[in-house]
C-alpha cells in the first residue's frame, strides 16, 4: 500500500551500505581532522588572505623557466600514454586540460563515459612535472588536487585505479578509521598526495577546511564532479554543493574544473557564475549518438507493457538494462521475466553489498544478460556492449533519461533505447514531487523551533546544535527539503553557518585491556572517561559534551581517546545520533513578524521547487509525445543541435513513423466525497490541509508514518484524482486560505 520509505532509489549515495549518520556526516568522527599540533604554513605566507596569483594566459612564467602551451600539452600527452595507456585525447579533453594547466577555470560537459575524470587526473599528475621544468617549486611542494563527488563508490573505484598505476591518491569517506584519517592528514602536510577525494558534506567540517592551509604546496586544483548539483535549476540539486564554491574561495584554490554529463543552458550559467568560469572555459560534447535508436511506445494500461517487452527482448538480443522506479518493481519484473523464459536479475540500493557486487560482476562478464534495476545501477558501469536500455516507466527528468541511455552502445555498434509510456505510472513521479513541499504551518513551526529563545540570545560566533532527524519527524518535513531550508538560512539569508557535526550518542563494550590501558595512559581525559562512563549491562555510555564542560576538557580530545581505545582493541565503540551544529552569523529573527516574513520567503522558494519538479515530468512526456525527432529534441534540451543542423536523426520512433507517439487521453474524475470523509474519519487533524491531501493521494511523510496512517484504507484512496483538487477540498475543511 503506497510507496515504502526505502523503495525509491534517489541515486545520490546509494553505492555503499552506510547508515544515515555516515551519510550526513561523511566521516568517522567530527574531530578526525582537527589537528592537535598544526604545522607551519607550507606556502610561507604569514597573511592567509593574500590571494594566489593566477598564471597569465598562454604561458606559466617564473624567473627560473618558462612553460609554453606546447610543452604543457606534451607533458599531458606523455601522462595520457604512460599512465593511462591511451594514444590520444578524445573530443574536448585536450582543450579542457590545456586550460587547467594554464591556470584557468573550466567547465566540462561530456556525456556519460566520455572521459571526464581524465580532465582533472592528468593535471594533478602534471603539476609536479611542470614544476620540475619551471623550478618554481620543490619536488614535494607541488600541492594537491581535491575532487569533490557525492558518489562514494565511484570515488573508491577511481582511487583504487590510480593507486594501481602508482599515483598517490586517497579518499576521505565514512569507511575510514580514525588512524587512516590521521595518516591522510600527515601525507597532506608532507606533500605526499597528488589527489584527495571527498564528499561535499566534508566541507562542513571545520577541521578539514582549516587543514587546507597546512597542505604542502597548497591546493592546485579542485575538481567538482556532478557539478549540476549546484544549480537550483538542475535535476538533482544538492544544497551542500552551494558550499563548494565558497570553499574554493576560502582556501584560495588556484583553479577549479567542474564536470557534469547533463547540463542545460540555465544550469551551465549557474555553474559558471558560482565558480567564475568565462564562456571560453566551457567545453561541451554533443549528447547525440548516431548509433542509438531512441524509441517509445505509449499504452493505455500498465499490464499492456508486458507483451511489448517480451516481443522487444525476443527481437533485440544482447546485454540489457531495464530501469524501474521502485525497488519492489525491479524485483517483481525480474522474477516475471525469468518465469517467461528471459533470465533476469534485479538490482537496487536495498540489497546487501555482496549481492550487488555479484550481480554487477556477472553483468559485466555477460554471465547475466538482463538486469532490472533502479537508478542505483549504472553509475561507473563502463560496459561497452550494452545493446538495450529499457525504461519500464517514465524517468523523472530528461537529464536522467539522457544519462541512462548513454550507457548503451559505447562500442559504437547499433543499440536500442525503448521507453514505455503509461499515464498510470505518472502517479509515482508526482508522488515524489509533491512529497517535498511541507505545509506553511509546518515550516513556520520549524523556524520557531530553530530560533527559540536560547538560540536568538546567542552572540555572534556562538554555536547551537539541532537534530535534523528529530525536526523532520516533529514538523513533518522530509530530510531533503529540510536540508534546502537550512542551506537557505546559511547561504541566502546569511543567518547561520554549518560547522562540524557531532555524534550525540557514545556507547562502548569494554574488553579485558580497557581498565589497564586507561590507567597506563593516566591523563585527565582517561580519568574523566573512567569516572563518567556509566555501565548498563554490557555497554558503557558517556555524554562527552557534559563531561567536557564539567571537567574543563576539550570534547575533541575525549573523542580522540575513545577512537584510540577502539583502534587498539580496548573497547568496541558504537556512535550514533548525529547532531548538526551551526554558528550564529548575524542577528536572528526574534519576533512573530520576523518569523512570518522568513516563512513567506522560504515557502515561496519551496513551492517553486515543487513546480519545477512537476514541470520536469511534463518535459519528459513532451519529449516523447511532441511532433519532433527524438534526437533533435534531446539535443535542443541541452542547447545543442543535430550534426549539420539537421531536423531529423532518421532513426528514432518519430522519424520511423512520421508521426508523434500518441498518449491515450486521461479520464477526467470528479473529487470523491466519500473518500474525503474516509480520510477525515482516519485522523482528527483539522489544521493541516496538505497533510490530509497527502494521506488521500498516498504520499508518505514523517508524520504519516508516525501515526501509521499509511496502514489505513484512507491512505491512497484518492491516488487516481487530481492532487490540487484534493488539496482545495481539504483547505475548505481546515478553513485555510490558498497558498
What is each residue range found by the language model?
Residues 1-76, 99, 446-449, 453-739:
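Accessory DNA-binding and partner-docking regions appended to nucleic-acid-acting proteins
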Residues 87-88:
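K/E-rich alpha-helical interaction surfaces of small helical-bundle regulatory domains
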Residues 130-141:
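Intrinsically disordered, low-complexity domain-flanking/linker segments in eukaryotic proteins
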Residues 75-80, 91, 95-117, 124-128, ...:
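Helicase motor core with emphasis on the C-terminal RecA-like subdomain
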